[in-house]
Amino acid sequence: MKQYKLIFCDLDDTLIQTISGETFPRGVYDMKIKFDVLDAIHEKLQMESSVLGIVTNQGGIESGKVDRKAFSNKMNYIISAIHEYLDCRVTASVCPTNQSSSYRKPNTGMLNQIAVQLCVNNKADCIMIGDASGYEGQFSDSDKKTAENYKIDYIDVGDLLKDEWESLIIHPEL
């Protein structure tokens, strides 16, 4: 299996989910880490020398539905928990706006920012994992489109948990 240097992951419904079962959390407390996904990332993508980069749209910050400081504390906790659990470097980029922005997925600003910071220049060394793949029942295809726009491999988080996961990786058209 190919080893990726940089593994981009969406946050909501990819790495975490609400405890309440609601689409949007009731507060920063309404979340649980998806350890089955972290285990799959570690085992299947051979995380030994990889960095996990969390990329997340959080338009609720701009609209005032989510407190910026509370969300920052939540992200710091998530980053620390994943770092400790996987024993790997974890970083994140958050787009707090609903407006048109080069950072808001499906645009690639967040991915590019992390790749530049980490000096990962070869896009063949990157993969994106997300839950917005355009599958039936999903709200959009923005995670898949982000990977397409950045020209990197992509896999839906649900597909990553399957036995035949390697055949479900979508490779970019170059």
Which residues are covered by each model-predicted region?
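Active-site neighborhood of HAD-like aspartate-dependent phosphohydrolases
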Residues: 1-53
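Short, electropositive alpha-helical surface patch
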Residues: 62-85, 104-118
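Short amphipathic alpha-helical segments and helix-helix/interface helices
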Residues: 38-43, 79, 111, 143-144
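Conserved Lys-Pro-Asp/Glu-containing loop-to-beta segment of HAD-superfamily phosphomonoesterases
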Residues: 103-141
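Short glycine/serine/threonine/alanine-rich loop segments
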Residues: 50, 120, 152
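Short, flexible/disordered intra-domain loops and linkers
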Residues: 22-29, 62-72, 100-104, 134-141
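Substrate-recognition element of Asp-dependent hydrolases with the DxDx(T/V) motif
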Residues: 38-75, 88-100, 129-132
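Acidic, Mg2+-coordinating phosphoryl-transfer loop and its flanking beta/alpha structural elements
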Residues: 127-170, 174
